[in-house]
Amino acid sequence: LAALSNGEVKLDNALWSEDTQVMVDALRQLGYKIEVNLDSLESGNRNLIIQGRGGSIPKGGTPENPMELFVGNAGTAARFLTAFLCLGKGTYRLSGISRMHERPQASLIEALRTLGYCIDSKNNKLPLTIHAGGPTFKSCRVSIEESSQFASALLLLAKLGGWNVEIDGELGAKSPYVAMTSSLIDCFPTEGGRLKIEPDASSGSYFWAAGHILSLNNCLPLKVARWPKSGWQIDAEFTSFLPLPNIVSRRDDLGDSIMTAIVIAPLTGHQTQFVNLERLRLQECERVQALRTELTKCGATIQEAGESLTISPGELKGAEIETYDDHRIAMSFAALGLKVPGIRIKNPCCVRKTFPTFFYKLAAPAPHGLGATILDGKGNKLKAEQLIAG
């Protein structure tokens, strides 16, 4: 939105992570001027200054030599840039890591083709080649069964493209992420200005979960500072699900923070069922299988049926956790490790995708962190400053 604006836009408190850098790098490669400055209040954030180009998207390459843009495993960047580049001129090619090439993109590609754009892809996934065509002033329908990012991508570009976007099914009207996109579009300073970005509630869930499970040992209460209050983020509701109820839905109750809830569920004094988990299978890894496998290692009793997991209460033990290069697997089990001794996280640097300072926050002394003891593979205590994922 800032790149599409008619002036200079300052974005304060922007999370600085691998996903953010992927988007900034792609826009810079296209020719946008973006200044990145340190945030004096939070070391893990940046203040960005973006020079908007009034809806003019820089020209790509030719069909024989398209402009190459790499998105890593950033699903948001992949989906948003796919729609964004359709409104440029010339030819662009989007690619990512192997897992990104497995993740769904078909509903978005089909909607853009309905709008009149030519997109080449062997299987309606990345890598793909976009032959841009500018505004088309047409209508399309899009399904968000696999990801609400498909609708968000189209809505962000709808005004510039002259698109009328309709969302299929009941999920469209109820999706909190689609509602958040619409709210942001309505309040964004499109003529230039400043926008303060609120903290990410999904990332905050690990600390609320830690506070909850540690309170079972009568530890001092833990509070997450500057908790989001806009009402836009579904995961801001995480605190209302502590202690966990009997049933939690990925579709109706929580977003990504449902993974946090699943991991701490064995510590609840009753059986908990998690339903509507189908989207978890299509993200950074096959998350339903990963959660079941790693929790079982820790001694949890889990039943998988269709798109649900039923978890029984019970005592847990330490285990080596395979993260599948998934940041949320690493962070969820790290939070569990504050309660269960012996949790060992493989490839902890995967948290750089969305929260590079996560382990720093665990180890830093209060009030800036939890003061947790974190050991390396040889049993040596690590300082907080050593735990920032580069």
Residue ranges, per PLM feature:
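Structural preference for solvent-exposed beta-strand-turn elements
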Residues: L1-G390
